[in-house]
Each structure stands twice: as structure tokens, then as C-alpha cells.
């Protein structure tokens, strides 16, 4: 069930990243950056949308394979590490949010628990 929840979280995160243009007023804010940095911000957001959406669909569609194979365990552990690093980064960089930090910590656990639970 946590694997399905993780897939759902990834899809929600894809949609969240898709909203960055309006949520963070990028039409006005990005021109303040150099063209290169503006492009990097937008390409990173698009990349995360594609990655999160794809992984979310894979986790939901192939939950048994994710739960019962070494590759699946590696993917779960990789995402747990990703979200752990992202949680730590939330409090290092300006504009941190306790609420987002808690959400990211929950994401870490959603992927870490099934990655570390022994199968019988």
C-alpha cells in the first residue's frame, strides 16, 4: 500500500512542479535571471514533471514488481535518499517551510519503509 501511496505522491509532485510557472509567477520572475539560469529553472521543472509522472505511473502499475525485486528495492531506496536530501536542503536554502519539510520527510518514509522491510 505504501508503494501505491508513493506512486500517488510522485504524480501529485509532478502536477505541483507543473504549476511552478503560475505559482511562482515565473512570467515576471524568470526574466530577472540570466537567460541560461531561466532556461535551467524551466528545464529542471519540466524534467521533474516527466520523471515524477513516469515513476508514479510505474510504481502504481508495477507495485508487485517494485515490492518483490532487487531493482524495485533499489528504486525505493534511491527515492528515499532523494527525498531525505531534499528534506535537508529545504532547511538549508532560503525560503524554507516547516510544512514542506514535514511533507518531504513523510515522502522519505513512504519510500524508505518498503525499501527496508524484509519479505517473508
Label each region the model flagged.
Residues 1-7, 116:
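N-terminal membrane topogenic signal
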Residues 3, 69-78:
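Membrane-interfacial loop-to-transmembrane alpha-helix junctions, especially the N-terminal start
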Residues 8, 12-21, 36-64, 77-83:
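Core segments of alpha-helical transmembrane spans in multipass integral membrane proteins
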Residues 17, 59, 90, 111-115:
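Structural signal for membrane-spanning alpha-helices in multi-pass inner-membrane proteins
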Residues 23-29, 63, 88-95:
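Juxtamembrane "helix-exit" motif on the non-cytosolic side of transmembrane helices
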Residues 30-40, 68-71, 95-104:
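Non-cytosolic membrane-interface motifs at loop->transmembrane helix junctions
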Residues 80-100:
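Membrane-helix boundary connector in multi-pass membrane proteins
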Residues 105-120:
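Membrane-water interface at the C-terminal end of transmembrane alpha helices
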Amino acid at each position: 500500500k505504501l508503494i501505491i501511496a508513493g506512486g500517488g505522491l510522485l504524480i501529485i509532485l509532478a502536477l505541483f512542479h507543473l504549476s511552478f510557472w503560475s505559482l511562482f509567477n515565473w512570467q515576471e520572475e524568470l526574466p530577472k535571471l540570466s537567460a541560461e539560469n531561466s532556461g535551467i529553472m524551466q528545464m529542471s521543472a519540466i524534467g521533474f514533471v516527466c520523471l515524477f509522472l513516469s515513476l508514479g505511473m510505474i510504481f502504481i502499475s508495477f507495485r508487485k514488481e517494485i515490492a518483490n525485486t532487487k531493482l524495485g528495492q533499489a528504486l525505493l531506496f534511491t527515492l528515499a535518499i532523494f527525498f531525505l536530501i531534499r528534506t535537508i536542503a529545504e532547511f538549508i536554502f532560503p525560503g524554507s517551510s516547516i510544512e514542506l519539510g514535514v511533507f518531504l520527510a513523510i515522502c522519505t518514509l513512504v519510500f524508505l519503509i518498503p525499501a527496508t522491510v524484509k519479505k517473508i
